[in-house]
Amino acid sequence: MSSTSQKHKDFVAEPMGEKSVMALAGIGEVLGKRLEEKGFDKAYVVLGQFLVLRKDEELFREWLKDTCGANTKQQGDCYSCLREWCDSFL
């Protein structure tokens, strides 16, 4: 597995509170805007979808691709970020 980004490290270091969806690793401005347009404006809303999908990597990656057009790397970065956050805080 590749090393995690600073964005990933910053996100998983603390409770997410009201962080923007763009605070998630793998989600930049373009994907963030697409997610916001579909009602996923906060990181915790994406976390909710992640949990509804039972933290299943394949289902979450597919959902992210279908919802905002995330590529394979972006999908993996976002999944890993949420998985590690859940391991620390849930």
Curated annotation (Swiss-Prot):
- Any idea which residues bear Phosphothreonine here? T4
Compartmental location: Nucleus; Chromosome; Nucleus envelope; Cytoplasm
Print the keywords alphabetically. Answer: Chromosome, Cytoplasm, DNA-binding, Nucleus, Phosphoprotein
Query: Its GO CC terms?
Result: chromatin; condensed chromosome; cytoplasm; nuclear envelope; nucleus
Q: Which residues carry this modification: Phosphoserine?
A: S2, S3, S5
- Alphabetized SMART domains for the sequence: BAF (SM01023)
Query: Molecular function terms in GO for this entry?
Result: DNA binding
Organism's domain of life?
Eukaryota
Gene3D superfamilies to which the protein is assigned, alphabetical: Barrier-to-autointegration factor, BAF
Pfam families hit by this protein? SAM_BAF
Q: Which GO terms describe its biological process?
A: chromatin organization; chromosome organization; mitotic nuclear membrane reassembly; negative regulation of protein ADP-ribosylation; negative regulation of type I interferon production; response to oxidative stress
Q: PANTHER family, alphabetically?
A: BARRIER TO AUTOINTEGRATION FACTOR 2 (PTHR47507), BARRIER-TO-AUTOINTEGRATION FACTOR (PTHR47507:SF5)
Q: What does this protein do?
A: Non-specific DNA-binding protein that plays key roles in mitotic nuclear reassembly, chromatin organization, DNA damage response, gene expression and intrinsic immunity against foreign DNA. Contains two non-specific double-stranded DNA (dsDNA)-binding sites which promote DNA cross-bridging. Plays a key role in nuclear membrane reformation at the end of mitosis by driving formation of a single nucleus in a spindle-independent manner.
Q: How does it assemble?
A: Homodimer.
Entry's family note: Belongs to the BAF family.
The record's domain comment reads:
Has a helix-hairpin-helix (HhH) structural motif conserved among proteins that bind non-specifically to DNA.
Protein name, as recorded: Barrier-to-autointegration factor
Q: To which species is this protein native?
A: Danio rerio
Q: What is the lineage of its organism?
A: Eukaryota, Metazoa, Chordata, Craniata, Vertebrata
